[in-house]
Amino acid sequence: MVQLRPRASRAPASAEAMVDEGQLASEEEEAEHGLLLGQPSSGAAAEPLEEDEEGDDEFDDEAPEELTFASAQAEAREEERRVRETVRRDKTLLKEKRKRREELFIEQKKRKLLPDTILEKLTTASQTNIKKSPGKVKEVNLQKKNEDCEKGNDSKKVKVQKVQSVSQNKSYLAVRLKDQDLRDSRQQAAQAFIHNSLYGPGTNRTTVNKFLSLANKRLPVKRAAVQFLNNAWGIQKKQNAKRFKRRWMVRKMKTKK
């Protein structure tokens, strides 16, 4: 703090007064310097700093304000109300978005539909067709049938002409079935001769099927045959089974009589 000093008189002062004034000025400068640096100074300047420190200690020692149950309950209710309002706002926003989407969807459907003029034309045309008399409808049906018959006759004529042209162009030959059987028998005899000459008793050759069947027979664990050597075995067994069945049926019928 800066102390105010009394105004000096205009009368000439003594030497002692001048010395006291110099000491006071030096003390005031020291006090100001101490205030700026935050250090206590000597004399009256140190007293206010001590008072400020005591005030800070009192402020630190003060306890926090106590909250009552009613105030805490009011704050909790206020918080719940805020949360409910936010949820309600979110729901309203979602509803508005859905409504907008539905409106846009309806507008797009309307754009895709045909214009009203074309729809009216189609409805009028269908009504006029329904209003026609049954006599006219029968006449139209008869005309269509006649046209179809004429087209069918024309197509039949074209087919007959094609058949005649084919028969005239191509020549057919008659062949007896006996000659065909002789040809088949000759082919079989030729195949048998080739087989005997290649795989006969005087040759050291065997077919693949025979070789595999012999290898399978020599194995300790028998496997399924790759291919049957004689295809007539199954046919003969079937024929024998049929004969046995017939005989058994005849014997049974005789015993019943």
Curated annotation (Swiss-Prot):
There is a cross-link at residues 131, 162 (Glycyl lysine isopeptide (Lys-Gly) (interchain with G-Cter in SUMO2)). The modification Phosphoserine is found at residue 133. Disulfide bonds: none annotated. One of its GO terms (biological process) is ribosomal small subunit biogenesis. Residues 1-94 are annotated as: Disordered. Residues 65-104 form a coiled coil. Residues 75-94 have a biased composition (Basic and acidic residues). Keywords: Coiled coil, Isopeptide bond, Nucleus, Phosphoprotein, Ribosome biogenesis, Ubl conjugation. It is found in: Nucleus, Nucleolus. The keyword Magnesium does not apply. Residues 48-65 have a biased composition (Acidic residues). InterPro entries: NOL7_C. Residues 1-25, 34-47 have a biased composition (Low complexity). Expressed in numerous tissues. Particularly prevalent in the adrenal gland, thyroid gland, heart and skeletal muscle. GO terms for cellular component: chromosome; mitochondrion; nucleolus; small-subunit processome. GO terms for molecular function: RNA binding. Part of the small subunit (SSU) processome, composed of more than 70 proteins and the RNA chaperone small nucleolar RNA (snoRNA) U3. Belongs to the UTP16 family. Functions as part of the small subunit (SSU) processome, first precursor of the small eukaryotic ribosomal subunit that coordinates the first two steps of ribosome biogenesis in transcription of the primary transcript pre-RNA and pre-18S processing. During the assembly of the SSU processome in the nucleolus, many ribosome biogenesis factors, an RNA chaperone and ribosomal proteins associate with the nascent pre-rRNA and work in concert to generate RNA folding, modifications, rearrangements and cleavage as well as targeted degradation of pre-ribosomal RNA by the RNA exosome. This is U3 small nucleolar RNA-associated protein NOL7. It comes from Homo sapiens.
